[in-house]
Design a protein with these regions (language model features):
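Flexible, acidic/Gly-rich N-terminal and inter-domain linker regions that tether
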Residues: 1-77, 88
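Surface-exposed loop/turn and secondary-structure junction residues enriched for glycine/proline
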Residues: 49-50, 58, 79, 83-85, ...
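Short, charged N-terminal helix-start/capping segments
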Residues: 11-17, 23, 86-97, 205-220
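Canonical Radical SAM [4Fe-4S] cluster-binding loop centered on the CxxxCxxC motif
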Residues: 71, 75-110
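Hydrophobic alpha-helical segments
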Residues: 59, 63, 75, 87, ...
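Generic secondary-structure signature for well-ordered alpha-helical cores
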Residues: 30-33, 37, 64-71, 95, ...
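Short beta->alpha linker loops
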Residues: 61, 81, 162-163
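Core AdoMet radical
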Residues: 97-114, 118-220
């Protein structure tokens, strides 16, 4: 499997920064007339300071693309927090293990009760959230939570620490629909200052997974 870090290393980010600084209004007009950016340089031009005079055309174009793919739909989901147990130390996160806070993992039967209450409020899509802790947040626990929530929320995603493909399989079998993974920064020096202990401290391990929402069956 090709890690994202390997692909990222091939991107000439500083070149794109320079292209954004050097772009012209004529170039931005050309890109807008074409319909959408065709290259990374085009995208850099559209987020450049020179493009500030074209915010309304950009907004209208973005609106057309959004409606083309999703229609006039707003999908709401409710986060359901399963556990704040975590073995990582991350400077920005409330779950960080060095934070002096009470730790709790919600029992599965209480998770079911919470899902039922959210369904009564109209939510049909849930995001199950937990910190990274192999003892308290195991595959079996999360899979059981998914099963208990399904009668009340047919669309369930999870926000957990990145795992290998086989570890996601029980979540798929339980009825999970998607997974959300965040990469806080791709700037290595900044990453190291933000993640000081735990598995997440290792950059290659964090970069080997795609960033953002993806289907839970992405591994086949």
């Amino acid at each position: 499997m090709t890690h994202f870090s390997q692909y990222f290393a091939t991107l000439a980010i500083q070149d794109s920064v320079q292209q954004a600084q050097d772009t012209s209004k004529k170039n931005i007009q050309r890109i807008l007339a074409h319909g959408r950016p065709q290259t990374l340089a085009d995208f850099a031009a559209l987020i450049s300071p020179e493009a500030s005079d074209y915010l309304e055309p950009l907004a209208q174009h973005s609106r057309r693309i959004t409606q083309q793919h999703f229609g006039k739909t707003i999908r709401l989901f409710a986060p359901l927090y399963l556990s704040n147990e975590c073995i990582n130390i991350c400077r920005y996160c409330g779950f960080s293990r060095n934070n002096p806070i009470p730790r709790h993992t919600v029992p599965v039967d209480q998770v079911r009760t919470e899902a039922q209450k959210l369904a009564q409020q109209g939510f049909r899509s849930l995001l199950l959230v937990a910190g990274e802790h192999p003892k308290h947040v195991s595959n079996g626990y999360v899979a059981n939570c998914i099963r208990e929530c399904l009668p009340y929320a047919p669309s369930i995603q999870v926000e957990l620490a990145p795992m290998e493909t086989p570890d996601y399989e029980p979540l798929v079998e339980a009825g999970g629909e998607g997974v959300v993974v965040y990469q806080e920064t791709y700037h290595e020096a900044t990453y190291r200052t933000l993640h000081t202990a735990g598995p997440k401290k290792t950059i290659p391990g964090a970069w080997m997974h795609p960033s953002g929402p993806m289907p839970l069956d992405f591994g086949g």
